[in-house]
Curated annotation (Swiss-Prot):
InterPro entries named among the record's database cross-references: Nucleotide-bd_a/b_plait_sf (IPR012677), RBD_domain_sf (IPR035979), RRM_dom (IPR000504), RRM_dom_euk (IPR003954), U2AF_small (IPR009145), Znf_CCCH (IPR000571)
Regions of compositional bias (Gly residues) in chain numbering: 212-222
Boundaries of every RRM domain copy: 65-147
Source taxon at top rank: Eukaryota
Omega-N-methylarginine modification, residue list: 165
Name of the featured protein: Splicing factor U2AF 35 kDa subunit
N-acetylalanine, modified sites: 2
GO biological process, one term: mRNA splicing, via spliceosome
Chain positions found as N6-methyllysine: 39
Naturally occurring in which organism (per UniProt): Homo sapiens
Subcellular location: Nucleus; Nucleus speckle
SMART domains in the record: RRM, RRM_1, ZnF_C3H1
Claim: Hydrolase is one of the keywords in the record: no
Compositionally biased spans, kind Basic residues: 188-208
Amino acid sequence: MAEYLASIFGTEKDKVNCSFYFKIGACRHGDRCSRLHNKPTFSQTIALLNIYRNPQNSSQSADGLRCAVSDVEMQEHYDEFFEEVFTEMEEKYGEVEEMNVCDNLGDHLVGNVYVKFRREEDAEKAVIDLNNRWFNGQPIHAELSPVTDFREACCRQYEMGECTRGGFCNFMHLKPISRELRRELYGRRRKKHRSRSRSRERRSRSRDRGRGGGGGGGGGGGGRERDRRRSRDRERSGRF
C-alpha cells in the first residue's frame, strides 16, 4: 500500500495531494482546493508571485482606452525586466541555473517568475531576504516552489502554438527572452567561470614571481561592467 501511494503521489490519481500544485507550484483553487498543497521546506526553485506586469495586458490611456504596445517595444520591456531580475538574483543570492516567467492570465500564474538556483541554500536565502523587499513599488511575495522540472510544468500545446485555452490555461505558458539576451546572460556565466579560473592562474603565477598585483586588471573590468549595468538599471522603471 505504501509503495502504491508513493507511486501515485502528485499525480491525478492522488486523491489527497494536489497534482497541479505538485507540478506547477500553483493551483487556481488556492486555499480553497480540496487537496493538499504540500509546500516544500527545501528546494532549488523559488517563485516570485505576480511580479511581472505585461504592458500589453495593463496599458490604458487616461480615458480608459487600451494603448497599443508594439511587439518590438514589448520585447524590449520584457528583456529589460528579465535581465534586471536575473542579474539581481545572481549577484545577491547565488548562481541561477534557470529562470522562467509565466505569460498566463489566470490569477494564480499571471506574472509569476520562477528562479532555479544551483544550490538549495541560495534559494532559501533568497526567499528570506526577498520577502522583506519591494519591486516596482510593490512588496515581493517569494516562496520555495516544488517545481524543478519545467518540462512537466509547461503547456506542450502552447509550445507548438496549439493551446486552445489561451492565457487561462492551468499549465505554464513561458514567455521567451530574445536570443541575444539569452546568449548574454547564460554565456556571461560561462565567461565568469573561465575568468575566475584564469584569475586564479594569474594570482598563482604572481605569487611565484613575488608580485601581488596580477589579478587586479580583471577586477577593474568587472567593476566597470557592473557600473555600466547599474547605470542602465537606474533608467528602468522596475527597480528593486
